[in-house]
Every structure is written in structure tokens, then in C-alpha cells.
From Swiss-Prot:
SUPFAM superfamilies to which the protein is assigned, alphabetical: S13-like H2TH domain
Compartment(s) where it occurs, according to its Swiss-Prot or TrEMBL record: Mitochondrion
Primary location: mitochondrion
Origin superkingdom: Eukaryota
InterPro entries referenced in this protein's UniProt entry, alphabetically: Rbsml_uS13_C, Ribosomal_uS13, Ribosomal_uS13-like_H2TH, Ribosomal_uS13_CS
Protein name: Small ribosomal subunit protein uS13m
Any one GO molecular-function label of the UniProt entry: rRNA binding
Annotated keywords: Mitochondrion, Ribonucleoprotein, Ribosomal protein, RNA-binding, rRNA-binding
Function: Located at the top of the head of the small subunit, it contacts several helices of the 18S rRNA.
HAMAP family: Ribosomal_uS13
Annotated family: Belongs to the universal ribosomal protein uS13 family.
Subunit composition and interactions: Part of the small ribosomal subunit.
Length: 116
């Protein structure tokens, strides 16, 4: 088991599959990172050397917005919506659905969890 950018990667998975578990890295970016570093597509996480792992961490940290940066950006966007008191900001505060979903019979559990 290995941790890269706060994501737990299982050793038995291939690098191309396991790297998509990192927040902010999708299939396309996983292929780009692997191609730039010259890592085979069939190699598994547990077969990587320490040097290759360090290279992957360094490349992901430099070129891509990942994990905490992504979460911070999302939180800042929500805070901005709340501060300007727009419809979506108010719905975020209430814990209600934002995009016009039905609330009479659905979304009850979501509202209960937030109001406790």
C-alpha cells in the first residue's frame, strides 16, 4: 500500500488504474504522467521503485491541482455563493438540493443529517 498526494493506492493494481484514485487525476492525466516518466502500462504499484514513486509525486505536485488544493477551491466557491446570498448559497446553508430536485418526498435524509 502506498500514499501519493493523500490517496491510498493498493499495491496489486496497475499504475494506470491506481493513479486515477488520486483526487484531480483522471484517466487521461494518468496516461500523460505515465508516458512522461516512461513507466509501462502493465506495471503494478508494488513493482515501482522508490525513485519512480518520487518522480510520480513530484510531477503530480508540479503540474496538476490535486487533493487539498481542489478541496480548498471548492470550499472557496461555496463560501462565495453563501456570502453573496444567492439562491445556491442559501440552499447550501440549508443543506437542501441545489439544482431543482424534488424535496417533498426525496432529500429527507440529507436534510436530517445537517439539522442535527
Amino acid at each position: 500500500m502506498l500514499y501519493i498526494s493523500g490517496a491510498r493506492l493498493v499495491g496489486d493494481e496497475q499504475v494506470r488504474i491506481a493513479s486515477t484514485k488520486i483526487d484531480g487525476i483522471g484517466p487521461k492525466k494518468a496516461i500523460q504522467v505515465r508516458y512522461r516518466l516512461g513507466i509501462s502500462g502493465n506495471i503494478k504499484i508494488k513493482e515501482l521503485t522508490k525513485y519512480q514513486i518520487d518522480q510520480i509525486e513530484q510531477m503530480i505536485g508540479q503540474d496538476h491541482v490535486v487533493h487539498w488544493e481542489l478541496k480548498r477551491g471548492e470550499r472557496a466557491d461555496i463560501e462565495r455563493l453563501i456570502s453573496i446570498s444567492c439562491y445556491r448559497g442559501i440552499r447550501h446553508q440549508d443543506g437542501s438540493p441545489l439544482r431543482g430536485q424534488r424535496t417533498h418526498t426525496n432529500a429527507r435524509t440529507c436534510r436530517k443529517l445537517i439539522r442535527k
